[in-house]
């Protein structure tokens, strides 16, 4: 953390960049582990993966049809079809392949290896399917084919060499780079690893993020509200945001405004946490329980630990906390309790921390420059970086504010796909002025 003496911290106002810098300096990528492919989805590859064998590993058919020699069908037409002797079936997974000689053909299925002697595949639709009639529309089942898999087939069109043949290594040649270190493993990447024969892979695991909200007024959605109560929305929103960032999220039910209860809850969650996120209780009120419970975290018992609470030059999200707890010094980020404040704080500070734990180079949301689309000028407090909610039109290059600047406006946040950034030295923004926007949608 930044080297400010304890007596000065109470009056210090930190910038957004200073706070983020301290967080990222204390958060390090998780240690790599070897995982089975089904468990590796969403994880980050820590080593280059090369292809041990070509993909596909052999020449194979891309169509259901007949494997033929090019010369045998060179003059084929509807009026004068090439009549070939069918010597057998070649299905996917076949071994002991028949050799196709002059005047011969082999029935072949999609994905089946091209038999020796064959130079091309003619789709079944270019033939009579061995029925002696007109053009076929589908391959007959092996048991229903005339004379089993034998007999004759009439081919109505010529084929060029290698027609409808997928060449060995046409997808990825042996020795080529399949996936680079730093790749996030999604379904296509998992499929590629399986296709080249990898059963396990070395990755950084998805961070385990525990989210808990505080406040005796909070009620689980679905329950009946009592006097002075509100539904707990923050823990649901932040857990969803953590999953969206790539983490495994655990949402803990709202904790009452009791410091001992909060400390005990946090201690219980350490066993399954790579990062702890709290929301609420970080301001200057009489019931700001997070600040009460964690401000006095004992560095004597856990050297290097403790949570520091700060005032940031930003709106919304002025009160923030950051530090570590427990014997393993699990990072903890304490966010404000107002819904918009907590979500904006997550995007600015928690999401980059999660991405850093994953070892990813791209920690932040994409950003763009956009012209303000508004009916009137906007005001912003001097000396604070303001984050307004907005909708971004990439084609027009504009951003339109949604709702006001209030930190409780959940409905406006739900309609937004961007955060409009008003710099600290700007107090008035005119329609048409260019501003930076953080793309969150």
Task: Give residue ranges: language-model regions.
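Conserved active-site and cofactor/substrate-binding residues in soluble primary-metabolism enzymes
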Residues: 11-18, 32-35, 39, 53, ...
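Structural signal for hydrophobic packing residues in well-ordered secondary-structure cores
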Residues: 24-31, 48, 114, 128, ...
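Structured loop/turn residues at beta-strand edges in well-structured enzyme cores
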Residues: 61, 101, 122, 271, ...
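Helix-rich terminal scaffold detector
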Residues: 1-3, 8-16, 201-335, 339-345, ...
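Flexible glycine/proline-rich
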Residues: 33, 37-38, 46-47, 60, ...
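Short, glycine/charged-enriched hinge/interface segments at domain edges or termini
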Residues: 2-10, 14, 67-256, 399, ...
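Short, low-complexity N-terminal leaders and the immediately following helix N-cap/first helix
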Residues: 1-78, 84, 107, 138, ...
